[in-house]
Amino acid sequence: MKDEVALLAAVTLLGVLLQAYFSLQVISARRAFRVSPPLTTGPPEFERVYRAQVNCSEYFPLFLATLWVAGIFFHEGAAALCGLVYLFARLRYFQGYARSAQLRLAPLYASARALWLLVALAALGLLAHFLPAALRAALLGRLRTLLPWA
């Protein structure tokens, strides 16, 4: 069982570490711009770091759920790769947003595409799981013909 989900677990742990990094950046920005909790407003430089962290945190549960469903029901490697792309895009998003609101846009779109791909993989995997066995075998046979490397 562990071998079947090791990549998903590694990407999950990397995601948790990335969330911790974002939180530490907010703590650092609070000190640099003298914004004490519970305040969430201050100079624009602080607010951008704060918003970037909050935005990343808001999407993290969606990311985790789709990562695991796609990895278990579709393909672990494909889901893990999409997960890595998503996390890298979120890191770039955070770094860009910390510098300027405009610099967040390209990584935001990249992370959204990766997340939607995970949603699609999860949905396809679940659909295949619930199809009758004969229909599933026929569809997988055709898919293997079209995509021999898969």
Swiss-Prot record:
Location(s) in or outside the cell: Nucleus outer membrane; Endoplasmic reticulum membrane; Nucleus membrane
Lumenal compartment segments: 28-48, 95-104
Parts of the chain that traverse the membrane: 7-27, 49-69, 74-94, 105-124
Reactions listed under catalytic activity: leukotriene C4 = leukotriene A4 + glutathione; (13S,14S)-epoxy-(4Z,7Z,9E,11E,16Z,19Z)-docosahexaenoate + glutathione = (13R)-S-glutathionyl-(14S)-hydroxy-(4Z,7Z,9E,11E,16Z,19Z)-docosahexaenoate
Residues the entry annotates as binding glutathione: 30, 51-55, 58-59, 93-97
Pathway: Lipid metabolism; leukotriene C4 biosynthesis
UniProt membrane topology term: Multi-pass membrane protein
Single GO molecular function: lipid binding
Keywords: Endoplasmic reticulum, Leukotriene biosynthesis, Lipid biosynthesis, Lipid metabolism, Lyase, Membrane, Nucleus, Phosphoprotein, Transferase, Transmembrane, Transmembrane helix
Tissues and organs where the protein is expressed, per its UniProt entry: Detected in lung, platelets and the myelogenous leukemia cell line KG-1 (at protein level). LTC4S activity is present in eosinophils, basophils, mast cells, certain phagocytic mononuclear cells, endothelial cells, vascular smooth muscle cells and platelets.
Record's function text: Catalyzes the conjugation of leukotriene A4 with reduced glutathione (GSH) to form leukotriene C4 with high specificity. Can also catalyze the transfer of a glutathionyl group from glutathione (GSH) to 13(S),14(S)-epoxy-docosahexaenoic acid to form maresin conjugate in tissue regeneration 1 (MCTR1), a bioactive lipid mediator that possess potent anti-inflammatory and proresolving actions.
PANTHER family in the record: LEUKOTRIENE C4 SYNTHASE (PTHR10250:SF4), MICROSOMAL GLUTATHIONE S-TRANSFERASE (PTHR10250)
Protein name as annotated: Leukotriene C4 synthase
Organism of origin: Homo sapiens
Gene it is expressed from: LTC4S
